Swiss-Prot record:
<dbReference type="Pfam" id="PF14520">
    <property type="entry name" value="HHH_5"/>
</dbReference>
<feature type="binding site">
    <location>
        <begin position="99"/>
        <end position="100"/>
    </location>
    <ligand>
        <name>NAD(+)</name>
    </ligand>
</feature>
<dbReference type="Pfam" id="PF03119">
    <property type="entry name" value="DNA_ligase_ZBD"/>
</dbReference>
<keyword id="KW-0520">NAD</keyword>
<dbReference type="InterPro" id="IPR013839">
    <property type="entry name" value="DNAligase_adenylation"/>
</dbReference>
<keyword id="KW-0235">DNA replication</keyword>
<comment type="function">
    <text>DNA ligase that catalyzes the formation of phosphodiester linkages between 5'-phosphoryl and 3'-hydroxyl groups in double-stranded DNA using NAD as a coenzyme and as the energy source for the reaction. It is essential for DNA replication and repair of damaged DNA.</text>
</comment>
<dbReference type="InterPro" id="IPR036420">
    <property type="entry name" value="BRCT_dom_sf"/>
</dbReference>
<feature type="binding site">
    <location>
        <position position="440"/>
    </location>
    <ligand>
        <name>Zn(2+)</name>
    </ligand>
</feature>
<dbReference type="InterPro" id="IPR018239">
    <property type="entry name" value="DNA_ligase_AS"/>
</dbReference>
<feature type="binding site">
    <location>
        <position position="304"/>
    </location>
    <ligand>
        <name>NAD(+)</name>
    </ligand>
</feature>
<dbReference type="GO" id="GO:0006260">
    <property type="term" value="P:DNA replication"/>
</dbReference>
<feature type="binding site">
    <location>
        <position position="328"/>
    </location>
    <ligand>
        <name>NAD(+)</name>
    </ligand>
</feature>
<dbReference type="InterPro" id="IPR001679">
    <property type="entry name" value="DNA_ligase"/>
</dbReference>
<dbReference type="GO" id="GO:0005829">
    <property type="term" value="C:cytosol"/>
</dbReference>
<dbReference type="InterPro" id="IPR041663">
    <property type="entry name" value="DisA/LigA_HHH"/>
</dbReference>
<keyword id="KW-0862">Zinc</keyword>
Length: 706
């Protein structure tokens, strides 16, 4: 899933204030985009197509362009989409992994290339196929693979080293006599399309659930707890980017690829270095016609400035490099019959219409469902039940219906009528003012909302309860063993008596997961409560600042809104949630079940690093990156992945990242070695500042990030 970033208004011309409708639409778009990003990156279960996601993102970016006051630091247009789960250990990348800006036609590409040319003349563009796979970061030290991680949120991903080691295309040891001391590379893991149907047939034969498409097959195969399962899957990888490095001296992207190949790393065979924009567009269109002639799925072409010096000059925004762009191909389209239109009820009560289709093969997978988003979208597209419809899909789970083929209507088609009552519980549906969505307001007993909320509470992005998935949530609810998320921490072996499909091994797995969840940090509980607008970023900010649910509930709206990363909208939603008596009852049952409602040390008063922002770069001897981050956060501080004027101190270990080191020097931010870091943790900023490392030393070359 990709996102088109908005740009700041630099014209100096005052913008008209946004209307109430525009503000409501922007807020609605932000909520919807955050939800879809969470489903795509964390759950591996998207519910809209890439094209629809891009359309929503473009609409929000356009609103923010017209009214810059709508653009907030936590807007989806300002973030690298993605998150990381806790199924695997979180690890921080040495250099941040950014997402790419998208263009969708020749005119947009010309505009992007013209912006680049205003900075400097470009005499070489590197073009390569955009693989529709899973982004992965590899770290080699002295030639040996020491870590592999998913992209995650761009700063932190999941450690998948044992699984990556099973890929035949990924060398565990680099070749040649001149291996770099440190080399961080980025690439894409993919499932060859020719092997995809074979895998699904095997899964179905043993009663398993088939993957929807090759990208999901790659993600699911790579996220196996048992590397032996990953080893049975024919995964491959292509390396296409450079992160942190020491002893890897090249001056261009193409030279880096040549050096990668010398070291035994898998590189693309179809990239070309071209001198002109017309040459680039010829490459784009040539491969658009031949997109099915390669071993993996592609959804576009990535165009990069080849020169590393010019890449450094162009720099990056908060989410994407200015020196690279993804030219996205239009999604593939087929026609099929729309058999029916039904609705689905989500965890927040949102009622979403979807189409049931005659199964059809498109973009490498067979689909029988397509989202219609909301009742306004059904009307706008003009589709009738029984229509032959145009279906658009670009490697996604649920594609979108573009519209009807009116000429093929026979007269038997009929209009869809949105139900006035919830199909799950019978409650009258409502449409909140300023929203496009219709909702079921019955949060107490609507089976669909209860199922979805339990599934979300237990998901990897929230409380991460191993074994408590959708089917388990459904079984427990239908049998009356739980009422809602408040009963999860009261599950016992007896809760599963008489339920089909729950062997003792499965029950033990779930109960171990519940026990582990009792000790999760506060921010995960906040995410799991399904408070509207509260995602991982806001939850971390609230937990860091206030440290307990009791303190959060007792804080005024004004003070909550003042917390960095929160704001008035989230503050209002939080207090509305706590004001609901049913929610207070749920929290009481969660607490009675032994779960923590506060972070460790919350009752001990001010912490030594309250208000302190730390950046860690390089390798520490006595701390892993995760333990160092936890140590700072436990004392009230915040660890970020990039250096800015808000940074209090930079902790410098062995082999620090060049860009962080140089940025800290240029901003004269105190740099601490490992001894200074220990003092920072024990005694605070004032004591540690006396041990700051002098801001001098040899110049370090900045490495490009992707």
């Amino acid at each position: 899933m990709s996102a088109t970033a908005g740009t700041a208004d630099e014209s100096g011309v005052a913008s008209a204030a946004a209307s109430a409708d525009e503000r409501a639409r922007a807020a609605s778009l932000a909520r919807e985009l955050d939800e879809h990003a969470y489903r795509y990156y964390v759950l591996d279960s998207p519910t809209i197509s890439d094209a629809e996601y891009d359309r929503l993102m473009a609409e929000l970016a356009a609103l923010e362009e017209r009214h810059p006051d709508l653009r907030t630091p936590d807007s989806p247009t300002q973030k690298v989409a993605g998150s990381y789960s806790t199924l695997f250990t979180p690890v921080e990348h040495l250099e941040r992994m950014l997402s790419l800006e998208n263009v969708f036609d020749d005119d947009e590409f010309h505009q992007w290339a013209a912006r680049v040319a205003r900075e400097s003349e470009v005499d070489a563009w590197l073009c390569e196929l955009k693989i529709d796979g899973l982004a992965v970061d590899l770290v080699y030290e002295d030639g040996y693979l020491v870590r592999a991680a998913t992209r995650g949120d761009g700063r932190t991903g999941e450690d998948i080293t044992p699984n990556i080691r099973t890929l035949a295309s990924v060398p565990v040891r680099l070749r040649g006599p001149r291996v770099p001391g440190l080399l961080e590379v980025r690439g894409e893991v993919f499932f060859p399309t020719a092997k995809f149907a074979e895998l699904n047939a095997g899964l179905v034969a043993v009663g398993g659930k088939p993957f929807a498409n090759p990208r999901n097959a790659a993600a699911g195969s790579l996220r196996q707890k048992d590397p032996r399962v990953t080893a049975t899957r024919p995964l491959e990888m292509i390396v296409h980017g450079l992160g942190a490095q020491r002893g890897f001296e090249v001056t261009s992207q193409s030279a880096a690829y040549a050096r990668f190949a010398e070291l035994g790393l898998p590189v693309a065979t179809h990239f070309e270095v071209l001198a002109t924009v017309p040459g680039v567009l010829d490459y784009v269109h040539r491969w658009g016609d031949a997109r099915h002639d390669v071993v993996h799925e592609i959804d576009g072409v990535v165009v990069k400035v080849d020169s590393f010096a010019l890449q450094r000059r162009l720099g990056s925004t908060s989410k994407s490099p200015r020196w690279a762009v993804a030219y996205k191909y239009p999604p593939e389209e087929v026609t099929t019959k729309l058999r029916d239109i039904r609705v689905n009820v989500g965890r927040t009560g949102r009622v979403t219409p979807f189409g049931e289709l005659e199964p059809v093969l498109v973009a490498g997978s067979t689909v029988g469902l397509a989202t219609l988003h909301n009742i306004d979208e059904v009307g706008r597209k003009g589709v009738l039940i029984g229509d032959t419809v145009v279906l658009r899909k670009a490697g996604d789970v649920i594609p979108e219906i573009v519209g009807p083929v009116v000429d093929l209507r026979e007269g038997s088609e009929r209009a869809f009528v949105m139900p006035t009552r919830c199909p799950e519980c019978g409650t009258e549906l409502v449409r909140p003012e300023g929203e496009v969505d219709i909702r079921c307001p019955n949060t107490v007993s609507c089976p669909a909302q209860l199922r979805e909320s339990i599934f979300h509470f237990a998901s990897r992005g929230a409380m991460d309860i191993d074994g408590l998935g959708y089917e388990t949530a459904t079984a427990l609810l239908e049998a009356g063993r739980v009422r809602d998320i408040g009963d999860i921490f009261h599950l016992t072996p007896e809760s599963f008596e008489g339920l089909r499909g729950f062997a003792q091994k499965k029950i033990d797995q779930i109960l171990r997961g519940v026990e582990a969840a009792r000790h999760r940090p506060l921010w995960r509980l906040l995410v799991g409560l399904s408070i509207r607008h509260v995602g991982p970023t806001a939850a971390r900010a609230l937990a860091r600042e206030l440290r307990s649910l009791e303190a959060i509930a007792a804080t005024s709206a004004e003070d909550l809104a003042a917390v960095e990363g929160v704001g008035p909208k989230i503050a209002g939603a939080v207090l509305d949630w706590f004001a609901d008596e049913r929610h207070r009852d749920i929290l009481a049952r969660i607490a009675a079940g032994g779960a923590r409602l506060a972070d460790v040390g919350a009752e001990e008063g001010p912490r030594p690093l309250d208000g302190v922002t730390v950046v860690i770069t390089g390798t520490l001897t006595d701390w892993s990156r995760d333990s160092a981050k936890e140590a700072v956060e436990a004392r009230g501080g915040k660890v970020t992945g990039s250096v800015s004027r808000k940074t209090t101190a930079v902790v410098v270990g062995a082999d620090p990242g060049a860009s962080k080191y140089d940025k800290a020097r240029s901003l004269r931010i105190p740099m601490l070695d490992e001894a200074g870091f220990a003092v920072l943790l024990a005694q605070g900023v004032d004591a540690a500042s006396k041990l700051a490392v002098p801001a001098d030393g040899p110049e370090k070359a900045e490495t490009p990030v992707e």
